């Protein structure tokens, strides 16, 4: 596990963007699972402005989770990515593999799981992303696996339907076996509200394993936390 700490959210975006460009340049093809949330939004803005010259034709984009809403809905992770990145770079449409949030959730979870099997290399009998980008909620959730549904992590399926604990909103999420089979997993976590969970999970305090984010242990050993100083305030 590596930990990168930057003074601000913008500098987290800068450091991660530099890292991502290096990965894209070093691979013939790069399969990336994207995350929603405020920190990826800043990353997308930064990359759209500073990394237009990346050869995006070698990059295939997927989503680690998506809300069960149409693609034009303001809640859609896909819509956010289009507005902040995809509309501003030259990437082939065939390289964008969105979750169909408008479709029946159970059927879409099954369909998207098959898409991943068709598009990604199969390693250890599991589809393998080059990079999975994850956020972490104040409650310790990651992707769309929440503490009250932590058993979804161990699903035999590639994708599952999750339910937000407060709103009841349904979401499609990749499961633990895909996350931990990735070549690299990168957490993007910023803000003081995350500091307690960051400390609990990274230092493996008692009870840490009740948070889905603590279950991110890629078999490759390549796990990187990109934090700002606020999120890292409670770790040494």
Model region roles, listed by residue range:
Residues 56-130:
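Ligand-binding beta-strand-loop-alpha-helix segment within the catalytic cores
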Residues 28-50:
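Glycine-rich N-terminal segment of FAD-binding domains in flavoprotein oxidoreductases
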Residues 109-110, 143-148, 197-201:
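A short secondary-structure junction signal
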